[in-house]
Regions:
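Unchanged
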Residues: 2-40, 129-182
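Generic signal for short, ordered secondary-structure residues
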Residues: 28-31, 43-47, 62, 122, ...
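Short, charged surface segments at domain edges that flank catalytic/cofactor-binding sites
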Residues: 39-57
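A generic structural signal for short
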Residues: 50, 128-129
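Cys/His-rich short segments
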Residues: 51-101
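N-terminal strand-loop-strand
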Residues: 80-123, 128, 150-151, 155, ...
């Protein structure tokens, strides 16, 4: 799919396990992982990919009702599930998370890395929004927890759906507060 295809063009996205994928295309070099190839997608295509993967992840993790443990069934074209015992309808959720470009007084940006990542993989800092917490409070908390600094000049940049597992990433910039040594 591309942004040049007419609105209403039918598209089908499927999440395949390795065996299914290799039966369609045996050359593993022709398959792309979203974390590596997603940057080259248009906004529309990235959104569709994220939506499909988030829904697939949600379905896989909600086969049973969280209230009573009974099996659930897919309803509403895959946009919901229903508990087969209680009839309760379950809907996919979106977990808000902030991702922050933290900039110091010399206009340097702070990058972090996780021990489980491959060597030389870096990212700006991110964390989920806690229940009852504002987005700005999340930025302030996360920058203090991860970098040990207080921040100012918090500015919202934009958002993007992210299917790991079903997040809405809310991007911000923030500055290290000027009265701190770092």
């Amino acid at each position: 799919a591309s942004d040049t295809e007419p609105i209403g063009t039918p598209l089908v996205l499927a999440v395949l396990d390795e065996k299914q994928a290799l039966s369609l295309e045996p050359n593993e070099q022709n398959w792309h992982v979203l974390r590596r190839s997603g940057f080259g997608l248009s906004n529309r295509d990235a959104g569709m990919y994220a939506q499909a993967l988030a829904l697939a992840n949600w379905h896989e993790s909600h086969l049973y009702c969280s209230r009573c443990g009974s099996a659930t069934e897919v309803i509403k074209g895959g946009w919901a599930r229903r508990c087969q015992s209680e009839g309760k309808e379950l809907y996919p959720r979106t977990d808000p998370a902030v991702i922050v470009s933290l900039i110091d007084d010399q206009d340097r940006i702070l990058l972090g890395s996780q021990g489980v990542w491959e060597e030389n993989r870096w990212s700006v800092l991110a964390d989920f929004v806690e229940p009852g917490e504002s987005l700005n409070a999340t930025v302030e908390r996360e920058m203090f927890e991860e970098a040990g600094v207080q921040v100012s000049d918090i500015d919202y940049l934009g958002s993007q759906g992210w299917p790991y597992p079903y997040s809405l990433m809310l991007a911000f910039t923030a500055r290290v507060r000027g009265d701190q040594k770092h």
